[in-house]
Amino acid sequence: MSNFRQTVYMKVLKLLVGGLLALCQVVHAQIDSVFLWPQNVPNSTKPKGKPIITTIADGSTRVTEITDPFFAVFEPRKETKNNKAVIVCPGGAYVRLAVIKEGYSAANWLVGLGYTVFVLHYRVPDAREGAFQDMQRAIRLIRFNSKKYAINPDKIAVMGFSAGAHLAARSGMSDSIIKYPKQDGADEVSGKPNALIIMYPGYLDGGPGKSLSPELKATNNLPHTFIFQSMDDGIVQSSFALASALRDAKANVELHIVPKGGHGYGMTPGNKAAEAWPILLAPWLKEHL
């Protein structure tokens, strides 16, 4: 992308993110947007371009056609900053991203607790392996630039919702082999997170008898993992498959299943599941990250 096009895109991006933040009434300032790939996006046949924002009938905002993946950075206030980081991966079935209710709203809450938050806008639609490359690259970039962000490089969690939870699980439970051509010095550091937050995941029960999907490897050397889902979610088996595999591997896992909530609630006011998980997650994060 030329310098001129990059400048224009950055202006569009600021308007995009700023508009989305206004929609969800985020009170903590975004400080930066960082593109993951300085040159060509690996395994992509699409040119870099601006994403598409749509609003559906229920008022939810979705972003798709992300061809130049990036993360948005949110800083806590100096007096509350705890030097820990959380990368948030919105869901959307690998077709779109629910960036407000599963991205910026969660970021706003986490920043209020003192965490530096990075909302990952990974490639969609239909780019699962590309999204995983984006995930690996984002972790490495953030860890490599830990001094810049004033965070501990060994205190980085990945939080994902729905398809984003599948992506988060892959980041901590796949082999550590880099899945793309090395770009720069950031790709010399570890791409593994230090903790996983798995929110109403999908795609994790693809193994025999609805067991853990084979691309995920459960060992006892895994990040501490928090899992949350509701029993009336049609894909709740994903949480059971993950928790069972982690239990058998004697990994550190905490599973919460509430009776009702459905799927895709994020931090929706009035949804009991949405109101329950922050209460459970806050002390867990404080202890395990």
Predicted regions and their residues:
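Primarily recognizes the serine-hydrolase "nucleophile elbow" in alpha/beta-hydrolase
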Residues: 137-220
